[in-house]
Structures are given as C-alpha cells and as structure tokens.
Design a protein with these regions (language model features):
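C-terminal helical cap/extension that packs against the catalytic core
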Residues: 365-422
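N-terminal leader/targeting and accessory segments in enzymes
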Residues: 1-99, 103, 239-241, 261, ...
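Short internal beta-strands
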Residues: 31-38, 215-220, 346-349, 371-381
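Beta-strand->loop->alpha-helix junctions that form or flank phosphate-binding loops
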Residues: 36-37, 55-60, 98-102, 143-146, ...
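Phosphate-binding loop of NTP-binding sites
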Residues: 4-5, 25-31, 48, 62-69, ...
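Nucleotide phosphate-binding/pyrophosphate-handling subdomain across enzymes
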Residues: 2-8, 18, 25, 29, ...
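A glycine-rich beta-strand to alpha-helix segment
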Residues: 71, 411-442
Length: 446
C-alpha cells in the first residue's frame, strides 16, 4: 500500500502535537484531512482555520460523509482508549487503521531520513536541524514534536528528498523509522509504565541505534559504538569550546573531524541548548551543508514554544518550560541560575503521570529542592488512573524547602500572586500551559 494514495486522512486524537504535524503534511499535498479530539485547544483552533475538519464529541455521526474504507486512512495514537466509539466503528467496518508512528515511518522510509532520538532535547534538536536545512535550501520536510517559533508550526515544509523526524521512544515508536542518520541526545530512563525496568529503556535505544543505516551521532559518554560524538568541552568528535557570552548569548567555536567553525552564536539560553545546537550542527556538517549557512541558521533560530520561553515585565522575569523529567528540571533550573545569579526563584511544577511521579520521586524531590520556593500542582493524569498514595502532597514531603505548598491548577495564579520572587518558572507537560497567558497579563499589569 502506498500511504499517499488515499483521498481522506482521518485522525483520532487530532490535537496531539505529533498527529497535527502529519495533518499539516497531508493537507500540504492536497489531501482531505479531518478528525476528532476530546479537547479544544489553541492548536486545534489553528488546525480548523487551516481547513482541517475537527470535532470534539466521540460520535460516529460527525464523521464526514465522503469517508469510506476504500478512500480513507485512519490514524490514531496509543492514548486513545480501547472503547472509543469512532475507533471501533472504523475497525469493525474494515477501514485501514494505523498508529501515528507507523504512518510517520511509511512517509519517511522512501526519503533520506534523519531521526532525532533521546529522552531529552529531541524536539529542540530536530527543530534546529530542520531550520538549518531550510536556511540552506535543502529539500527537506521536518516533522517536529513542538511548535518551532520561526515557523509557528510543528512542520517545516521544503520538499521531500530528505526528512527530519523526531524519533519518540514512547511505546518504542522510533523503531518504526528507517533512518539513514540519527542523533541520540540521551538515553535516560523514562516511560517505565511501558518499559518496566530502567535497563529496558537503554536496550530500546540500542535497538534504535542498530537500525541506523549510515551514521549515528551521540552525546559524548553514551554507550554507542562506532558513532560520532558531540558535546561541549568534552573533547568529542564535534566539540564546542572557547565558550563565551556576548550580549547575553552563547558564542563558541566547534572542532569537527575535518576542520572547525569559529564564532558560532546561538540565541537559546542554557548549556543543554548549546549541546542541542552542536548535535544539529554535526549532522548538517556531515551532510555537507556550508558552514556559513549553518552559522546563519543557528544565529537566527528563535526556539520552540514551551522550551525555556522568557518574558519580562515590571522588573519580574517569567520563564515557561516543558520539563517533566528530573534531568530536564535540573537543566531548566541550572539555566535560570546561570542567567540570573542571586535572584529568588519561584517554581510552579505540574507533575505529569502518576507512574512517572512514583518512579522518579526521589529525583524530583532533589531537583525541586534547588528552587527557592515551590508551588506544586496536582498530578496531571494524562492517560492514567490514580495510584493510591501517589499524590502531590506525598511528593512535596521529598522537597527540602521551607517555602513550599500544594495547589490546584485553578488556584495557582492566586497563589503565585501571594509569593515574593524575582524569577518565576512554570514547568510541566500537562495543561499547565493554560496559565501562561494569565500570568503574562498579570505581570504586565503589576
């Protein structure tokens, strides 16, 4: 089956960040795109404005009339429950039904695919790489797991000879890809609800590395043989060094296997983003992208929404970040401390998933203890049911701070207003993003 032969593409879970990139791709090649999601969001509103027909009630009567088993591909995410009426309607009536990861694998397998994997950093790294290739006018489509600020989109469309795909370890989705090149930014344990043991996560990354056809690029220190390494001051194959801060931004030189680049500048804050930039630079250099184009792209990449987005008003600094794993929290807090030494930092954290909170409770406690004060929100369940005893009050006991409280999301802004802080940091992967705009409005008025 040629996946591009259908007329209609119907998405169950249409508001998901990975799903919507596929919707935009099919729309861009002239296909009819429709779908369902349980929640109306800013993203679904944008998709509807782009001509994608989305409804928000699980009701087979709302499926567009022209859809039939011959002309339609149905795409769903693993988060969709087994008793979903529309999904079962399509299964019973012999529609072709595929997971998002399978579809991404089919779209990219006939291209020169570059997979970007890793427990942390893959969205930013794939977005930077997609931007470099766009600036260099390489015929490439990049499927992203976040909204790249330069394009206000989670897809960069510029031809289909090459593809960049965020290679997600959840549900072992990345094993559906056929990458010629790949980056692995990290292999930390996560998704233990899927993998069970921490070693199983690392084993899965080894399986991904084994399917890379041409060359693998990994952060220096990761256990992958035969790969190019990258890092910052790590004497890696691609190594950033002579790091300095000019006008508030990182500037550095990069040693490569065959030469060097000097005075490379990035706009993104944080040591981890310097590493992400070097990873993307390494692949672009290997692909033969001219160094002046690489430097131009890195100096103009603005960032990804909810990846350390900064806002300043009336003497207060506000940063919003997607961090939802202890390693990511450490990176975000480290970046705040680097940028704003001596400032009082208030963190607002929404734990994501009961299983992740349980499995990494000690690490979360240590990470959050690096703040000056903490508002800990209720756990965002996503696809999970509650686990007895695993609550935000339980997690709060593991945080070594004098100033700490638990709050509902609804009461969070009122609680923030009562706090004394110089820097406010909101972090989490659930629906904490719904308070970002109200916080900015309040800070602007204060």
């Amino acid at each position: 089956m040629n996946i591009l032969d259908k007329t209609y593409y119907y998405f169950i879970g249409a508001g998901g960040i990975g799903m919507s990139a596929l919707e935009r791709f099919f729309k861009s090649i002239g296909k009819e795109v429709a779908g369902y999601d349980k929640t109306q969001t800013e993203l679904t509103t944008e998709l509807i404005a782009e001509g994608i027909d989305i409804h928000f009630e699980d009701n087979i009567d709302l499926i567009p009339a022209g859809i039939n088993p011959e002309n339609t591909l149905v795409i769903y995410t693993p988060a969709v429950p087994k008793d979903h009426s529309e999904l079962n309607y399509f299964l019973v009536n012999d529609f072709k039904v595929m997971k998002r990861s399978e579809v991404l694998g089919e779209i990219t397998k006939h291209t020169y695919n570059i997979g970007v994997a890793g427990t942390h950093g893959k969205t930013t790294t794939s977005s930077i790489l997609g931007h470099i290739l766009k600036v260099a006018n390489v015929e490439c489509t990049a499927f992203l797991g976040g909204i790249a600020e330069n394009y206000d989109s989670n897809i960069i469309l510029n031809g289909s000879k090459y593809t960049v795909a965020e290679a997600d370890e959840f549900d072992r989705s990345f094993l559906r890809l056929s990458p010629k090149l790949a980056i692995i930014t990290s292999d930390d344990a996560d998704h233990l609800d899927i993998y069970g043991e921490r070693d199983e996560v690392k084993k899965s990354f080894q399986e991904f590395a084994a399917i890379v056809e041409e060359k693998l690029f990994v952060h220096k220190g990761l256990p992958f043989e035969g790969a190019y390494t990258y890092g910052v001051d790590l004497d890696a194959d691609y190594d950033a060094h002579n790091v300095r801060i000019i006008d508030g931004h990182y500037v550095f030189d990069v040693k490569t296997p065959n030469g060097s680049l000097t005075d490379v500048g990035i706009l993104l804050p944080g040591h981890h983003n310097m590493e992400n930039a070097v990873a993307a630079l390494a692949v672009a250099d290997y692909m033969g992208v001219p160094h002046d184009k690489i430097k131009e792209a890195l100096s103009t990449f603005v960032g990804v929404k909810r990846r350390f987005n900064r806002f300043e008003a009336n003497g207060k600094i506000y940063i919003d970040d997607y961090a939802h794993h202890p390693t990511e929290l450490n990176a975000a807090i480290r970046s705040v401390r680097e940028l704003y030494p001596g400032k009082k930092v208030l963190g607002v954290f929404q734990p994501h998933l009961f299983t992740r909170t349980r499995d990494f409770a000690e690490e979360f406690g240590q990470s959050l203890s690096q703040l000056d004060s903490l508002i800990l929100l209720d756990i965002y369940p996503a696809r999970e049911l509650p686990i007895e005893g695993i609550t935000s009050n339980w997690l709060l006991e593991k945080v070594n701070l004098n100033e700490k409280i638990v709050s509902s999301l609804e009461d969070s802004l009122a609680n923030i207003k009562k706090q004394d802080f110089d820097v406010l940091l909101t972090v989490g992967a659930g629906n904490i993003d719904t308070i970002v705009k109200p916080i900015k409005e309040w800070l602007s008025e204060a």
